[in-house]
Amino acid sequence: MNENILWLHELRLADLARVGGKNSSLGEMIGNLAGLGVSVPGGYATTAEAFKDFIAHNDLSKRIFDRLATLDVEDVNALTLAGKEIRGWVIDAPLQPDLDRDIRSAYAQLCAENGGGDVAVAVRSSATAEDLPDASFAGQQETFLNVTGADDVVHKVKEVFASLYNDRAIAYRVHHGFKHEDVFLSAGVQLMVRSGVGAAGVLFTLDTESGFRDVVFVTSSFGLGEMVVQGAVNPDEFYVYKPTLTAGKPAILRRSLGSKAIRMVYSDVPGERVRTEDTPVELRSTFSISDEDVQELSKQALVIEKHYGRPMDIEWAKDGVSGKLFIVQARPETVKSRSHATQIERFALEAKGAKILAEGRAVGAKIGSGVARVVRSLDDMNRVQAGDVLIADMTDPDWEPVMKRASAIVTNLGGRTCHAAIIARELGVPAVVGSGNATDVLSDGQEVTVSCAEGDTGFIYDGLLPFERTTTDLGNMPPAPLKIMMNVANPERAFDFGQLPNAGIGLARLEMIIAAHIGIHPNALLEYDKQDADVLKKIDAKIAGYGDPVSFYVNRLAEGIATLTASVAPNTVIVRLSDFKSNEYANLIGGSRYEPHEENPMIGFRGASRYVDPSFTKAFALECKAVLKVRNEMGLDNLWVMIPFVRTLEEGRKVIEVLEQNGLKQGENGLKIIMMCELPSNALLADEFLEIFDGFSIGSNDLTQLTLGLDRDSSIVAHLFDERNPAVKKLLSMAIKSARAKGKYVGICGQGPSDHPELAEWLMQEGIESVSLNPDTVVDTWLRLAKLKSEG
């Protein structure tokens, strides 16, 4: 059109200096990716040149830069005063006549091309240094939604111009070495997506916490996307596995149902563009988008990532009328994609017996502690001192000047892609978002410890608790002398642990997934209609979003298994089928009516005996169904199955039959079925058991207690428990030699090699194929065994 206005479809990344990162990226996608299935709403942008002319037209340059030249951005009061003053100058200044005319003319054309009448648009900022790989200006300038009519568009463009001098934008430029006079603004005017009656959110093409590159992380909530971006809602979350998605298979690894308490919608009140309202109760217990939507968004995200050649941070919206999905922003991810994986930092909390005050979604994997500072408004921000723990309902970009002082951040609202989470990652401090009630349960001045080192859930503890911080250098790791695998119980830590050098996961405990992510006895779900009212109430709360009870059990199990299996693919993952004892099953919701009382559950109704017992047959079939889903539907065939506590040869043969009846046929699609070698009978009859199974994984914990005749849960005889006992080592040696002679797999997954490095050395000398260790001992054991091997 002219030097004031450019249409988005005309723009490319090369136009960054003319229209800023956001608008040039939109143009890049419209021009290059529309044919590949990426849908971006159209619109136009004012140019940086037009902004410069506006500033010059009103003689604002000298006034603005003189005002900023002596400003101390660490003085929050002075920063607030300067920002307010400069924004006032900009708002009061008129647009140059040709820019005013061109904005109106372009809006009229946009309306004519989209059905006539005043179309709704979003007016967004796009800074000329914004969204570069080394900067994250996201959210620092203003966005206005559901703007209609030429007069309002013109006014909002000027407000966007003024927002270049928001307090947080001024402070950010100073902190990151950008000269104020080198940053200009473009206003993007883009067609609105009717997500007020649909859904919207943010996605990343990597895991935001670990940096794991093989997933797309999607967040979603009902209504306009601002609620997710701001952190005003706890959204739904989804992890999608890229290789499975690319292969055209169901690819959702994990789902998490958010509370989604409020939503932002279009307002029908004159003068009010949008409003927030309570999300209808019946919608809160459902996922805001379908699995098909999640997969489609992820496909578009992969196209964008491939085109840009780097991990991306993407905002999306679903039109609630047409059902169509749109990409409304895409920018480079600026935190995890720049971190270097040659060093891994680990935090471990000594929290035994500590009082938990609040919990929410963990951001990062660090621990911080300090004095809690409850901030309820911008007026309270000056009270935050260096090292304090910032406690707030939510944060927005106005808070950034003081957020960098905090040792940790805790919010009532928000998910992992909200403002507080993004800034916490940039600052490298732990954050717990979506806690619900932190500002109510934490007292101003109270000493607290914030831990994000325990998985997806972050905890706020009472007091200043001791914790360890270790840094491990992964550079120049020597070749491992044998397969070093990991024991991983919690799928929430899988992506993080997967960054360690490893040959796979040697023990993934299915019962841990049942306990942490299901919490209900499988028979109670199979017999849902027979449960008491109080049990039904608990079950209904757990299964929200999953439809029927049985689907919940199978899908949650499959999600946990798939997450673990994907985290180290294509390396092997050995999933041990459930090994709860009767007392542990009884503690699950609805479990007491299905479990016998046993005097010694440790050697009672557990493992293989359950799988072939009529009382548990249907429940076991659900486990098989989950494994089948992961292997066959999702294509994660690096998954092996392991059977625990096989007492007799006959029991072993029966289990193989039951597995086959449930679709898990030995050898089919490369399926290996191995057994835990954890009873003396297993080692003594190793040759015979290996005729039935594809290999052994030695469970040194149970093997030790059963060989020495002691209860490992008894403190009285605990001092006698030692995997290095000669009797135990003799059985270990028998099992290893039998497996080697038959050319079958043999590894160990018990605690012994993690606790006793010399046992790991002895096992290597005996010819064991793999040792599976606790993740925190992997690197040290790796280096120790490699050194031993090199010394001959």
Predicted ranges, named:
Residues 139, 309-334:
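Conserved metal-phosphate-binding beta-hairpin within the catalytic cores
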